[in-house]
């Protein structure tokens, strides 16, 4: 996979090229990396296997990540399988109830490994996973025909206070840094607090989120 070449699991203390200037933040990170690795040995966020650095996955978990590929639904990227219709056809669920979007760019299919990565970032505080996950997402984005706005879904202020960060905002900022659009952090507004969506089905989630997020009138 092309995105794996950009995400090697190298030692955190690897010597940088002398031709690249180091920012104070990068210098501090390089200095503290061996100490961080000593206190918190690098582990795969999906299975717990030892790693060479704090960022990345073990080889076995990389192999278990399923990147959507052709043939797949032209609307939601649901895989058809080898015996299904050709690439770009529309799947039965999308035909039965056309979604209100122009298309989905899925970084991976939902399985045990991808679920653990999302939970590690969202509820485990593993914010160092954001750049890696953003690269997976960016690799699946279609070419932009004009200016692309990257608008993260906001958290309610109390949820943001409890968690300390908005995972959607972290991913959006990394995607902007990769050159895939312009970040607009205030494009949406959270109007009310909602319960945790964990364990809810699609219908229950839609019911809970109805009216909870609106477009910023500004």
Regions found by a protein language model. Name each.
Residues 3-218:
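Glycine-rich phosphate/pyrophosphate-handling loop used in enzymes and phosphotransfer proteins
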């Amino acid at each position: 996979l092309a995105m794996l070449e950009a995400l090697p699991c190298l030692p955190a203390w690897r010597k940088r090229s002398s031709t690249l200037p180091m920012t104070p933040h990068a210098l501090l990170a390089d200095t503290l990396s061996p100490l961080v690795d000593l206190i918190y040995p690098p582990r795969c966020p999906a299975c717990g296997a030892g790693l060479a650095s704090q960022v990345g996955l073990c080889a076995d978990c990389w192999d278990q990540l399923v990147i959507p590929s052709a043939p797949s639904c032209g609307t939601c990227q649901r895989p058809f399988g080898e015996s299904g219709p050709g690439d770009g056809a529309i799947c039965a669920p999308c035909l039965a109830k056309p979604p209100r979007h122009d298309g989905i760019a899925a970084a991976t299919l939902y399985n045990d490994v991808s679920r653990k990565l999302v939970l590690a970032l969202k509820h485990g505080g593993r914010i160092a996973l954001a750049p890696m996950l953003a690269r997976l997402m960016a690799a699946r984005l279609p070419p932009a025909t004009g200016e692309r706005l990257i608008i993260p879904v906001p958290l309610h202020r109390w949820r943001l206070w409890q968690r300390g960060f908005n995972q959607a905002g972290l991913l959006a900022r990394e995607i902007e840094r990769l050159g895939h659009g312009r970040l607009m952090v205030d494009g949406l507004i959270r109007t009310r607090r909602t319960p945790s969506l964990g364990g809810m089905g699609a219908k229950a989630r839609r019911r809970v989120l109805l009216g909870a997020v609106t477009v910023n009138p500004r």
